[in-house]
Amino acid sequence: GKQWDVDFRSFIATAEGVVESTDASVHPLAQYWYNGTGTYLDIPLTTDGCSWNTPNFDGSGVSWTDSGSDSTNHYVTSSYDTTYAPVGGGAWYHSGSDGTLYAVTQSFDTRSSKDLKINAKTVVSLWYSSSLGVNSSASLPNYGFITKWESGVEFNTNTQIQPVMQFYSVDTNTIYPPQLEFKWRDYSSVLTGSAT
Protein backbone atom coordinates (compact mmCIF):
# COMPACT_ATOMS: atom_id res chain seq x y z
CA GLY A 1 0.00 0.00 0.00
CA LYS A 2 0.97 3.60 -0.41
CA GLN A 3 2.29 5.52 2.59
CA TRP A 4 0.42 8.71 3.46
CA ASP A 5 0.13 11.27 6.21
CA VAL A 6 -1.94 14.38 6.93
CA ASP A 7 -1.38 17.55 8.97
CA PHE A 8 -3.96 20.04 10.18
CA ARG A 9 -2.70 23.57 9.49
CA SER A 10 -4.10 26.82 10.79
CA PHE A 11 -2.40 30.16 10.20
CA ILE A 12 -1.98 32.92 12.77
CA ALA A 13 -3.68 36.28 12.25
CA THR A 14 -2.69 37.91 15.57
CA ALA A 15 -0.77 36.75 18.63
CA GLU A 16 -0.36 38.54 21.95
CA GLY A 17 0.96 37.58 25.37
CA VAL A 18 2.86 34.41 24.48
CA VAL A 19 5.64 35.24 26.94
CA GLU A 20 6.57 31.76 28.12
CA SER A 21 6.45 28.22 26.84
CA THR A 22 2.78 27.30 26.43
CA ASP A 23 1.04 24.27 24.96
CA ALA A 24 -2.07 24.32 22.81
CA SER A 25 -3.93 21.14 21.95
CA VAL A 26 -6.12 20.30 18.99
CA HIS A 27 -9.08 17.90 19.39
CA PRO A 28 -11.85 16.61 17.09
CA LEU A 29 -15.12 18.34 17.99
CA ALA A 30 -17.90 16.17 19.45
CA GLN A 31 -20.94 17.97 18.07
CA TYR A 32 -22.16 20.09 15.20
CA TRP A 33 -21.67 23.87 15.54
CA TYR A 34 -22.65 26.98 13.58
CA ASN A 35 -19.80 28.92 12.00
CA GLY A 36 -21.39 32.37 12.19
CA THR A 37 -20.85 35.27 9.80
CA GLY A 38 -18.71 37.69 11.79
CA THR A 39 -15.31 38.90 10.65
CA TYR A 40 -12.38 40.41 12.50
CA LEU A 41 -13.02 44.00 13.65
CA ASP A 42 -16.71 44.07 12.61
CA ILE A 43 -18.44 47.26 13.73
CA PRO A 44 -20.90 46.58 15.20
CA LEU A 45 -19.58 43.26 16.46
CA THR A 46 -21.32 40.28 14.78
CA THR A 47 -22.30 37.67 17.38
CA ASP A 48 -24.27 35.04 15.45
CA GLY A 49 -22.90 31.51 15.37
CA CYS A 50 -21.31 29.43 18.11
CA SER A 51 -19.86 30.92 21.27
CA TRP A 52 -18.42 29.87 24.60
CA ASN A 53 -21.96 29.09 25.79
CA THR A 54 -23.58 27.35 22.81
CA PRO A 55 -22.73 25.52 19.56
CA ASN A 56 -25.64 27.28 17.81
CA PHE A 57 -26.28 30.94 18.62
CA ASP A 58 -27.03 32.85 21.80
CA GLY A 59 -30.63 32.33 22.86
CA SER A 60 -30.98 29.04 20.93
CA GLY A 61 -31.31 26.98 24.12
CA VAL A 62 -28.76 24.44 22.81
CA SER A 63 -25.80 23.65 25.06
CA TRP A 64 -22.44 22.07 24.43
CA THR A 65 -22.44 18.31 25.15
CA ASP A 66 -21.50 17.38 28.72
CA SER A 67 -18.51 15.20 29.51
CA GLY A 68 -19.03 11.43 29.33
CA SER A 69 -19.14 8.62 26.79
CA ASP A 70 -21.17 8.93 23.59
CA SER A 71 -23.12 6.20 21.77
CA THR A 72 -19.94 4.84 20.13
CA ASN A 73 -18.01 4.83 23.43
CA HIS A 74 -15.77 7.75 22.58
CA TYR A 75 -15.00 9.80 25.67
CA VAL A 76 -16.28 13.37 25.31
CA THR A 77 -14.97 16.16 27.51
CA SER A 78 -15.65 19.86 27.71
CA SER A 79 -13.65 22.95 28.53
CA TYR A 80 -15.57 24.77 31.17
CA ASP A 81 -14.57 25.20 34.79
CA THR A 82 -17.54 26.17 36.99
CA THR A 83 -15.25 28.54 38.92
CA TYR A 84 -15.14 30.81 35.86
CA ALA A 85 -18.33 30.07 33.94
CA PRO A 86 -21.42 27.95 34.65
CA VAL A 87 -21.28 26.10 31.30
CA GLY A 88 -19.63 26.20 27.92
CA GLY A 89 -16.28 26.10 26.26
CA GLY A 90 -16.86 23.49 23.58
CA ALA A 91 -17.07 19.70 23.58
CA TRP A 92 -14.54 17.39 21.97
CA TYR A 93 -13.56 13.76 21.68
CA HIS A 94 -10.77 12.95 24.09
CA SER A 95 -10.21 9.25 23.42
CA GLY A 96 -11.71 6.09 21.98
CA SER A 97 -12.92 3.05 23.89
CA ASP A 98 -9.64 1.35 22.95
CA GLY A 99 -7.65 4.08 24.74
CA THR A 100 -6.53 5.88 21.57
CA LEU A 101 -5.95 9.54 22.46
CA TYR A 102 -7.18 12.03 19.87
CA ALA A 103 -5.52 15.23 21.12
CA VAL A 104 -2.35 16.50 19.49
CA THR A 105 -0.28 19.16 21.23
CA GLN A 106 1.97 21.90 19.90
CA SER A 107 4.25 24.10 22.04
CA PHE A 108 4.65 27.85 21.57
CA ASP A 109 7.13 30.27 23.07
CA THR A 110 8.12 33.89 22.54
CA ARG A 111 10.07 33.37 19.32
CA SER A 112 8.45 30.28 17.82
CA SER A 113 6.18 30.28 14.79
CA LYS A 114 2.58 30.66 15.92
CA ASP A 115 1.07 28.78 12.96
CA LEU A 116 -0.47 25.42 13.90
CA LYS A 117 0.84 22.32 12.17
CA ILE A 118 -0.20 19.11 13.89
CA ASN A 119 -0.38 15.53 12.71
CA ALA A 120 -4.03 14.55 12.19
CA LYS A 121 -3.71 11.07 10.67
CA THR A 122 -5.45 9.21 13.52
CA VAL A 123 -8.53 11.46 13.46
CA VAL A 124 -8.73 11.81 9.66
CA SER A 125 -8.49 8.00 9.30
CA LEU A 126 -11.46 7.62 11.67
CA TRP A 127 -13.42 10.31 9.80
CA TYR A 128 -12.74 8.54 6.50
CA SER A 129 -13.77 5.13 7.88
CA SER A 130 -16.95 6.71 9.29
CA SER A 131 -17.87 8.25 5.94
CA LEU A 132 -17.65 4.82 4.29
CA GLY A 133 -19.52 2.99 7.05
CA VAL A 134 -16.40 0.90 7.71
CA ASN A 135 -15.70 -0.27 11.27
CA SER A 136 -18.74 1.30 12.93
CA SER A 137 -17.32 0.58 16.40
CA ALA A 138 -14.55 3.08 15.66
CA SER A 139 -16.63 5.66 13.78
CA LEU A 140 -16.07 9.32 14.52
CA PRO A 141 -18.25 12.03 12.96
CA ASN A 142 -16.42 14.94 11.32
CA TYR A 143 -17.34 18.20 13.05
CA GLY A 144 -13.90 19.73 12.58
CA PHE A 145 -11.29 20.60 15.18
CA ILE A 146 -11.16 22.77 18.30
CA THR A 147 -7.94 24.36 19.53
CA LYS A 148 -7.51 25.14 23.23
CA TRP A 149 -4.84 26.18 25.66
CA GLU A 150 -3.58 23.74 28.28
CA SER A 151 -5.78 23.96 31.41
CA GLY A 152 -3.10 25.80 33.42
CA VAL A 153 -3.30 28.68 30.93
CA GLU A 154 -6.97 28.47 29.92
CA PHE A 155 -8.24 28.93 33.47
CA ASN A 156 -5.48 31.19 34.81
CA THR A 157 -6.63 34.62 35.99
CA ASN A 158 -3.09 36.05 36.22
CA THR A 159 -2.92 38.79 33.57
CA GLN A 160 0.73 37.87 32.93
CA ILE A 161 -0.36 34.41 31.72
CA GLN A 162 -3.15 35.10 29.26
CA PRO A 163 -1.93 34.54 25.72
CA VAL A 164 -4.33 35.35 22.90
CA MET A 165 -3.96 33.87 19.44
CA GLN A 166 -6.43 34.40 16.60
CA PHE A 167 -6.28 32.27 13.46
CA TYR A 168 -7.64 32.92 9.98
CA SER A 169 -11.04 31.29 9.44
CA VAL A 170 -12.37 29.23 6.57
CA ASP A 171 -14.08 32.39 5.29
CA THR A 172 -10.92 34.49 5.13
CA ASN A 173 -10.32 36.62 2.06
CA THR A 174 -6.60 35.77 2.28
CA ILE A 175 -4.59 32.75 1.15
CA TYR A 176 -4.52 31.43 4.74
CA PRO A 177 -7.68 29.40 5.48
CA PRO A 178 -7.22 26.37 7.76
CA GLN A 179 -6.46 23.23 5.79
CA LEU A 180 -5.69 19.56 5.82
CA GLU A 181 -2.34 19.02 4.12
CA PHE A 182 -2.09 15.50 2.67
CA LYS A 183 1.26 13.91 1.83
CA TRP A 184 1.90 10.56 0.24
CA ARG A 185 4.63 8.51 -1.31
CA ASP A 186 3.48 7.58 -4.80
CA TYR A 187 6.42 5.49 -5.83
CA SER A 188 8.07 2.24 -4.84
CA SER A 189 11.77 1.66 -4.49
CA VAL A 190 13.06 -1.01 -6.82
CA LEU A 191 16.48 -2.44 -6.18
CA THR A 192 18.36 -3.66 -9.22
CA GLY A 193 21.56 -5.63 -9.43
CA SER A 194 22.89 -7.72 -6.61
CA ALA A 195 24.38 -6.94 -3.25
CA THR A 196 27.44 -8.96 -2.35
Show the residue positions of the predicted features.
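Secreted, disulfide-rich extracellular signaling modules
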Residues: 1-196
